Amino acid sequence: MRVRYKPWAEDYLKDHPELVDMEGQHAGKMTEWFDKTQPIHIEIGSGMGQFITTLAAQNPHINYISMEREKSIVYKVLDKVKEMGLTNLKIICNDAIELNEYFKDGEVSRIYLNFSDPWPKNRHAKRRLTYHTFLALYQQILNDEGDLHFKTDNRGLFAYSLESMSQFGMYFTKINLNLHQEDDGSNILTEYEKKFSDKGSRIYRMEAKFHSQK
């Protein structure tokens, strides 16, 4: 999805307590941003925030982090957090490659990857969020019981991700090849997912863990 640049977005994001600043040492201290010490779940690439804000509202016993690098859409997540009065959701405006700057080893319980950019050209494979470089980061910050939830409408990215995770030493606890046909009612739609599922697009989903987190 191409994001339209909004020159005012950067100023808008300044001085909001819901936004984790990009300065200083955060690894191991992320719980200090929340009112309560609770398990931490992250969504990488939150878009406009429908998925993560819905989760946070439904699960006040979990602390959520929305990680989105595009300032021009982060403000939409911020507005939702403020409007809904969510105290268990904070926002990081940065790239996923910087994950270990924010989280120490074993600090996270779950990672969500929803409709990530497929980067279809082979020369761009290293940018895919299921490339081995990113998997190594996830393994580092997830605790021993932690898992990864992945959802996409792109069959090629799904097949690539299954292979990439298997080669990295992960195993799958759930695989859905047509999520909306198999859904038990627990699925939370993203904005993107709603748009394309209404057009009949098949949605693929998996849950995976590392054989050895450390």
Swiss-Prot record:
Substrate binds at K121, D153, T190, E191, Y192, E193. It comes from Staphylococcus aureus (strain JH9). S-adenosyl-L-methionine binds at E43, E68, D95, D117. Catalyzes the formation of N(7)-methylguanine at position 46 (m7G46) in tRNA. Gene3D superfamilies: Vaccinia Virus protein VP39. The lineage of its organism: Bacteria, Bacillati, Bacillota, Bacilli, Bacillales. This is tRNA (guanine-N(7)-)-methyltransferase. Its EC number is 2.1.1.33. Belongs to the class I-like SAM-binding methyltransferase superfamily. TrmB family. Keywords: Methyltransferase, S-adenosyl-L-methionine, Transferase, tRNA processing.
